[in-house]
Amino acid sequence: LYNYKNRYLLNASFRRDGSSVFYKTGNTWDNFYSFGAGWVMTEEKFMQNQNVINFLKLKGSWGVLGSQNTGSSYPAYATIVSSGSAVFGDNIIAGKGPNKLISPTLGWERNYSWEVGFDMHMFNDRLQLSPVYYNKTTKDMLTSIPGIAGTVPGLQNVGEIRNRGFELSASWNDKIGEDWRYGLGANLSTIDNKVLSLVNKDYNIISGPSRVSEGYPIGYFYGYKVEGVYQNEDDIRFSPINSVGSVTPGDLKFADVDGNGKITDNDRTMIGNPTPDFTYGFNVNLGWKNLDLTVDMMGVYGNEIYRNWGSSSYAQLNYRTEQLNRWHGEGTS
């Protein structure tokens, strides 16, 4: 840490982390580091002849940290589990095998991040603002690759994910007389999430309706876009041919995304993103002498939710009111 006249600030850190998680692959230890700098502009002479801005600091940082979070204690060691059986003579012998394949180079996941922003206090420190732009890229992700054609899954360092966006916090604190005080605060954070690379461009990790694919947000929802409802037989006849299955009036009409005049598996696409556009929060505090009251509120906006529990014809719970607007004849929906 270096501080020159409370005006120019520099800091740097270095750490060498070790984890027995990667002992078997010889990657127990790895190096991680970070750098940061700040400039307190209100310490400069050209900021002295004003009384609006009490404090203004420009700041920036860059660094890399490691992660060993793989979802299990010792991921480099496979567990022997039952794996089919075979007949030898008159005997049936139970088979055993590893529950996963381990990459011989399995090691630390690396998180590279940088950010720039500033801290500003105004009006005798009553108003405080702190906007920041951040960019974080996770490389060598510890990824469980699902097995293909009956093979066991594998654990590898593969893939790259980027998260970037803005963070803003603001607050106002003041007093009313000698006994009363109050404060208002708000924060906002945006996120742009994208998978930059995976095993290859055409590779997908599938979990129910969610997918992880190169070029898309992580865990996006994958399926058919719905354009409406087939109203009658003529509507079916003059619409793209549905090769997914037979349809009748009242069935959902899917979009012909690839434009080939047919509804096929290739028309499935991204239909939703579970990552919110932004998160937000508010807080209000009120004080009188030695008593304090604080209210915190928070929420998210812009994320889609995949819900299919209303699709069953044998409902275990009450149906949602949307069922009242179901299709029940030509032109009703």
Model-derived regions: residue spans:
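Extracytoplasmic gating/loop element in the C-terminal half of outer-membrane beta-barrel translocons
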Residues: 19, 246-249, 300-333
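Membrane-proximal, glycine/serine-rich, low-complexity loop/turn segments characteristic
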Residues: 69-86, 202-205, 213, 217, ...
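Predominantly transmembrane beta-strands of Gram-negative outer membrane beta-barrel pores used
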Residues: 34-36, 185, 283-285, 294-296
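Proline-rich low-complexity regions
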Residues: 39-41, 274-276, 333
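Extracellular/periplasmic, surface-exposed regions of secreted and cell-surface proteins
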Residues: 1-221
